[in-house]
Amino acid sequence: MDFVDFDTLNLSDDLPQPQRALSLPIATNIETFGRKFYNLNSLTRNLLKRDNNTDTEKSENQPQVAEKYANLSLSLIEDTKNADNDHQEPHSDIKISALSARLSRVLNNPLSDSQIRQIFGSLEDTLRSWDSILEPGALGSMSRRKLRGEIERTLIRNQTQTLKEYQPVIKNLRKLEENVDALRSASMGVVDSVNNDFESSEIFNSKMENLHRKKTAVVVKKQLLSAFRAKFTLNEYEEYTLENGDISDEFFTVLAKAEQVDQNCSILLSIDNSQLGVKTMARVNRLVTRASEKVVAYANRTLGNLYALNNRDRVRTLHQCFVYLRHRPHYLNSVLATFVGSRSKTLVDEFLGQANSRVAGSSPQSEEYQDPVRVIGDLLAYIHSVVVSESETISGIFSFENDSVDETSRKEFGEIMNDCVAKVLQSLAKPVRAKLEQIISREVRISVLFSIHHLAELYYIMFSKQIKQDHMGLVATIESLVESAELRIVTTVENKLTTIRNSNSAQLQLNIDLQPPEWIIDFYSEILPMLDQTHTESIFKDNSLVNMVVDQPIQIYEQHMENSQVKNFEKRDKYILQLNCLDLILSKIMPISVLTDKVILVNEKIKEVSDKLVETQVSSLLEESGLTDFYNIVNMICPINDDFFDVSIYEPITENKLFTEDNIRQVNSKIQAFLPTALLDIQQSLFKINSPLVVNEIITESAIKYSRFYGRFQLICDEYLKVPLLAWSDGEVATLLGVEDAYFDEQ
């Protein structure tokens, strides 16, 4: 077995000695060794089978060699036990230990499948030549030497490959060694140089520290001086900008800085030497005051020349002036007052020029008399154009860009704009009021006054929408113009009615034809179309005009009836004349929506006069039929026209001397002679009433009342005289009077 221990065992024996079993720590790989190679069992069986065959062959062919080896082994065992036990035991342990370590390192080393496959392939090749290796002769010795040489070559090759892997590392380590030596020598030089320089740097550091401390003090002083100068003083250029520079963005920037300096100087008053703060504040205040006055002058100059507002840069600068002056109300109010005064004077002069020379080549006075509506319309149109133009101009002055001011400032300037517009336009209030009221006061035509009123109302609405804030200005003036027109209308109508009231010719118009007087027709023909065209009820808010239009004409013709020849007319004719006048008034005012309440009043008066005429007509029927005395007697006992009727109530009539059969027969004769033509007589007496409805109503009601009395009186006669003296029934009487249907419906 010298092929196994060729590198460790150097025995002088010819044959190898048997060795005891090795104790190998190969538990890890040996347990999984069979699982890695599925054909390990078959390989083992083949090897065992081959060994058996070899042993059999050797036992057959060479029994002598086997016997020799067996005897030799036994003798060696005995010698080992007896003679060399003490000497061989340590050496054997060493060999066993070395072999165990090698085998365990080999077997426990984790190998890949390919490496294991290669190992076992080499082992298989070795096992194939196992027979020649085990031969005891020269051939076996040569085979074993060959195997030993192959193993050595393999081992050398493997070791050489392993050493080749470390060769680059060794080369790098040698190069690194050179670099490390150079670095070590350089570091030693640096350390020596640093040690030499350290001593000299301490002196240098102390000097640098002193210089740095001085530099810090100088820098602090410089910063303090710079901060003081920036916070409490203005440089020469900034002072020049405030005193002599143009109004621009730079000017307002410097002005804001000057105001900030003025505020900051207040802290200087608290130091020991307060003169510095006082002088600084006085100088800065003087600069700020001059700059503010300069801003005010620029704003006044720009607002005084509206053509300059066409330049956007100038407008933007003006807006900056407004923003600056917003925090100084006395300056801003001064600018606005100057602007309002200038614009007010200009507008008043232009209006007076327009009013005095409106039409070239004609007399303004004559035109005002001929066509006052046109004159007032032109003046109001001119004023409206002035309002629109002035509103747009002032709105353009106070309209800021989106990013120039905040929302609060924009709202504040919007209020200032509306206030300026109101104040400027307020200057037109007095001249406009004087001129228009002068024209209205001279006008006496109702149609013209109504046209002026409508025109003034229209422009009042337009001015109210255009002017946001008025302060008793132009809008109030137009409103007063509307009121003046209303008052003038009422006064004119009242004067006209007064003239009619006192007119003798109007009284003479009441004649025997019982028709309404002509002045009523003329009056309503003039005034009602004007009322019909009125779309607002402001003119009727106090009902004075309505009362004059309806109530006073009624009062006037009633007064005329009392004072004229009509007072000698019969009562029926007076009532007919009243009905005709009221019917005419009703027909005139009914289409006018604003006179709806008066329509109800006139209807009530017509009903009142109609009832009087019905009573007159009933009295006439009773008188013609001889029933007047009996009618009075019955009504003295109990009113005959009540809905409740009982014959027993009228028993006291029997005590009256007139209630006799002879008198009743005479009444019956008169009735039979009168009633057949009574309807024609009634219609003839009411022929002069203009309204057929009123005539029909009077005839119907009077006939029904007469028929009702006749029927009830007939019952009284039948009850207490016991003889039917009245030939006709109440139904027949109603038929003769043409009201049978209405009478029976009432029953």
Swiss-Prot record:
UniProtKB keywords: Golgi apparatus, Membrane, Protein transport, Transport
Cell location: Golgi apparatus membrane
Keyword Transmembrane attributed: no
Domain of life: Eukaryota
Pfam families per the UniProt record, alphabetical: COG6_C, COG6_N
GO cellular component annotations of the record: Golgi membrane; Golgi transport complex
Classification via SMART domains: COG6
GO terms (BP aspect): intra-Golgi vesicle-mediated transport; protein transport
Similarity annotation: Belongs to the COG6 family.
Function recorded in the entry: Acts as a component of the peripheral membrane COG complex that is involved in intra-Golgi protein trafficking. COG is located at the cis-Golgi, and regulates tethering of retrograde intra-Golgi vesicles and possibly a number of other membrane trafficking events.
Protein name: Conserved oligomeric Golgi complex subunit 6
Species assigned in the record: Meyerozyma guilliermondii (strain ATCC 6260 / CBS 566 / DSM 6381 / JCM 1539 / NBRC 10279 / NRRL Y-324)
This protein's encoding gene: COG6
